[in-house]
Design a protein with these regions (language model features):
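Conserved ATP-dependent motor core of P-loop NTPases, especially the RecA-like helicase ATPase domain
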Residues: 1-167, 171, 258
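Short mixed-charge
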Residues: 1-2, 350-358
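A short hydrophobic/aromatic micro-motif that marks alpha-helical segments and, especially, helix-coil
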Residues: 27, 161, 208-209, 274, ...
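Acidic/histidine-rich catalytic neighborhood
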Residues: 346
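Oxyanion-binding/catalytic loops of NTP- or PPi-dependent enzymes
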Residues: 320, 349-350
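Conserved helicase NTPase motor core
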Residues: 7-11, 16, 32-41, 45, ...
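Coupling/switch/interface segments within P-loop NTPase motor domains and analogous charged loops
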Residues: 57-89, 96, 151-245
Length: 364
C-alpha cells in the first residue's frame, strides 16, 4: 500500500519536478521544456561557431590565437572546440561551476606555491612507500640475513627518512636527486633471504628512479617557468569556456528550453540557501525532507557531485539508503563520480545498527 504513494522516478524527473514547483524563486519560465540530446548538441555547435567567429574577428585576437596555436593540431581549431566542450561539461558536474572555474584560475595566480605544495604531497607519498618497503627490507635482513647487507640498508633508510624533515619543495627535490644506493657487500654469506632482500631493495630503487623520471627531470626554476606558461593558457581557456557557457545559457533562455544539466542546477538552487560551500536547506528542501520518510537511491555509483548534494538536502537523519556497485559504474561519459560511492563504502561500518551502516549482502 505504501509503495503506491512513493515517488519513484529518475533523478532528472525529480529535479524537473522541483524546478517547476519553484520556478518563481529560480526566475525561470514555468513553460520551459526539456531539450533532447540532439537539439542540445546542435545548439552547442551553433554557439561555438558564433563564439569562435567573434574571436577571429576581434580587434585584439592575440589571446584567442594563442589558444588555437597551443590547444589545436595546427590544421584546424577542432581540438580547441572539443576541449571547450569537455571542460564545460566537466565543470557542470560540480555544484558551483563558476566557483570551480575561479578556483582553477586562482591556483595559477598563486603560482608555484600552490603547485609546488601539491607536488610535494605527491613526492612524499612515493617516499613514504619507499620508506615502508625499506623498513621491511631491513627487518628481513635483521632476522634472517644477510647481515653484511645491513650497513647499506640502514644508509638507504636514513637517506629516505631524512627527506621528511625537508621544509620546502626545492629541498625535497634536491635530496631525492642526491640519493645514493651503495653497492651491497660482495662478501660470501649463507642466507635463504638473500635474493628476497635484493629484490625488495631493487623495488625501492625503482620507486626513486620513477620519481626522478616523472617529476624531477627539470629543475625548479624550469618548473616555475612551466607553471607560469601553463597558467597563461589555462586562465584564458577557462575564460573562453565561461563565455561559451554564458552564451549557451542565453540561447536556451531565448528558446525557453533546458538540458539535463540545467535541471540538476535548477533543483540545487531551489534547495539551497546560503553558499555552496556551506549549504543551508531552503524552505523547499525542508518541506521535501519532511515529506519523505526514506530516500532511496539505486545505481548510486553513477551519481555526480551535484546529484549527491541534492539528495543530501532532501534527506533527514538516518533515512537515506544507497544501493550500488562501484565495479558497475558505466556512466563516466556523463561525468558520474564513482568516488562518491567508494568513499562511503570505505568509511561506513559493517556493525549492525551503526549510524552509517554498510550492508555488503544487500541483494541476498
Amino acid at each position: 500500500v505504501l509503495l503506491n504513494h512513493a515517488d519513484i522516478m529518475t533523478i532528472h524527473s525529480f529535479c524537473l519536478s522541483v524546478a517547476r514547483e519553484n520556478y518563481n524563486r529560480l526566475g525561470i519560465d514555468p513553460a520551459f521544456r526539456v531539450a533532447d540530446e540532439t537539439e542540445t548538441l546542435l545548439i552547442k555547435a551553433e554557439i561555438l561557431d558564433r563564439l569562435f567567429e567573434e574571436k577571429y574577428g576581434s580587434d585584439e585576437p592575440e589571446d584567442f590565437f594563442y589558444l588555437v596555436e597551443n590547444y589545436s593540431d595546427g590544421t584546424s581549431d577542432v581540438k580547441l572546440r572539443e576541449l571547450v566542450l569537455k571542460i564545460f561539461e566537466f565543470m557542470r558536474s560540480y555544484p558551483n561551476p563558476e566557483g570551480w572555474i575561479e578556483k582553477q584560475k586562482l591556483s595559477y595566480k598563486d603560482g608555484e606555491d600552490y603547485w609546488f605544495d601539491m607536488m610535494k604531497k605527491y613526492l612524499l607519498f612515493y617516499i613514504e612507500g619507499a620508506v615502508e618497503l625499506t623498513k621491511t627490507t631491513v627487518e628481513t635482513a635483521e632476522i634472517s640475513g644477510p647481515e653484511t647487507y645491513l650497513p647499506m640498508l640502514y644508509d638507504d633508510l636514513e637517506q629516505l627518512e631524512d627527506i621528511y624533515g625537508s621544509a620546502s619543495f626545492e629541498e625535497i627535490c634536491l635530496k631525492i636527486k642526491n640519493i645514493k644506493f651503495s653497492a651491497l657487500s660482495r662478501k660470501k654469506c649463507e642466507s635463504e633471504t638473500k635474493e628476497k632482500v635484493k629484490y625488495l631493495r631493487d623495488r625501492v630503487k625503482k620507486i626513486i628512479s620513477s620519481v626522478n623520471t616523472k617529476f624531477l627531470m627539470r629543475n625548479t626554476d624550469e618548473m616555475k617557468e612551466d607553471i607560469k606558461k601553463a597558467g597563461f593558457g589555462i586562465c584564458r581557456l577557462l575564460d573562453l569556456v565561461k563565455e561559451f557557457s554564458d552564451m549557451f545559457d542565453e540561447e536556451k533562455k531565448r528558446r525557453r528550453i533546458a538540458d539535463y544539466g540545467d535541471l540538476e542546477h535548477y533543483c540545487l538552487k531551489a534547495l539551497i540557501d546560503g553558499s555552496y560551500d556551506n549549504p543551508v536547506k531552503s524552505q523547499a528542501a525542508e518541506e521535501l525532507t519532511s515529506k519523505y520518510a526514506y530516500v532511496m537511491t539505486d545505481e548510486y555509483q553513477d551519481s555526480n557531485a551535484v546529484q549527491e548534494l541534492i539528495l543530501s538536502l532532501v534527506s533527514g537523519e538516518r533515512n537515506r539508503f544507497m544501493v550500488g556497485d562501484v565495479k558497475q559504474s558505466i556512466y563516466s561519459f556523463r561525468l558520474a563520480n564513482p568516488d562518491i560511492f567508494a568513499e562511503k563504502y570505505n568509511t561506513y561500518s559493517l556493525k549492525k545498527g551503526a549510524e552509517k551502516e554498510r550492508i555488503d549482502t544487500f541483494l541476498s
